[in-house]
Amino acid sequence: MLALLLTGIHVQAQKLKPSELAHTFSIVARDSKTGEMAVGVQSHWFSVGTSVSWAEAGVGAIATQSFTNKSFGIRGLALLKEGRTAQQALDQLLADDEGRDVRQVAIVDARGNVAAHTGKKCIQFADHITGDQFSVQSNMMLTDKVNSAMAEAFKASSGMPIAERVLAALNAAEAEGGDIRGKQSAAILVVPAKSEGKPWEERTTDLRVDDHKTPLVELGRLLKVQQAYEHMNAGDLAVELNDMPKAMQEYGTAMKMQPENLEMQYWTAVTLVNNKEIAKAVPMFKKIFKADKNWKELTKRLPAVGLLSTTESELARILAL
C-alpha cells in the first residue's frame, strides 16, 4: 500500500492511514450570481466524496486531499462561521498541523474569498490555481495540464448552474489524463448562499459515486436524474398552489428527461385523478400496470390515506386495467 512508502516522510503527531489517501483533483467554487458554493472531486480511491468534500450553507466549501486531514473540513467550516476569511481559516488549519507538507487544501467562503495550499511533499504533478471565486487543485496527476484545464472549463461555463460548471471542470481534468492511477469515485456537493437554520434541507446537490469504472459519466447521469426530480418537486408545488397547467408542464418536463421512470408517470397519473381528469390518467395507469403490476397494488392502498381522491366506480375502472 502507498501508506507503507511514506516512511521517509516525517509527520509528527499524524499517523497516516490508507483511509486518509485522497490523491485526486478537485474544485471549490462560489456562484457569483446565486451565491451557491460547491465542491467537486474525482479520484482513484473508494468513496472520495466522504473524505474530500465539505460545505455548509451560508458558510463556505472546503476540499481537503492528498494525505487527507478530514478534520480540516469540520474545523475549517467552524472557523469560517466565526468570521474568519478563507485565508485566515486556512492559515489556522495549517499552523495546527505538523503534516502540512503532505496536505492539499482549498477553501472558498460565503463572500467569495479563496485560499489554497499545496504541500511541498505532495506527489507530482501537484499544484493549484486560484481564480475569481474558485480554486482548482490536484496531486498525483498524469500531466501538469489538469489544473489549467479545470480553470478554463469552469470560466468558460459561466451562466450555467454551479453543479454543471463543476462537472465541466472535472471532465476537463479527466480529458487531460487526470489521476495517474485512473479513476474510481467522484462527488459533487452544492449548498445555498444563506442558511435558513434547516441544515437537513440545505444541500442543493449532494451526489456521490463511490465505486465505478467511469465515475464522472455516472455522476453526470445522476445530476440529470436530480434535475428531473426537481421538475417533479416544482410540479408538486404548483399543485399546492392550484396551478394545474404549471404542474403538468413541470411533470411533463420531468418525464421527458426520464422516460423510463415509472414513478414519475405514476404520481402524475394520480395527480390527474385527484384533479378530476381520469380520462387522461387511464392510459398512463394502463402503461404503468403493464410494466409493473405492483403499482396496481399500491393504487388500492392510496384512498385509505387520502392520497387518491376518487369514487369507487372510478377506482374500479383504474384497477380493471
Language model segments and positions:
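Short coil turns that delineate tetratricopeptide repeat
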Residues: P259, K293-N294
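Residue-level recognition of tetratricopeptide repeat
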Residues: D236-L237, V270, A304
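TPR alpha-solenoid repeat register
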Residues: M264, L298-T299
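Canonical tetratricopeptide repeat
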Residues: N233, W267, R301-L302
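Alpha/propeptide regions of enzymes that mature by internal proteolysis
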Residues: Q14-R181, D210-D243, K256
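Register position in tetratricopeptide repeats
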Residues: E240, N274-N275, L308
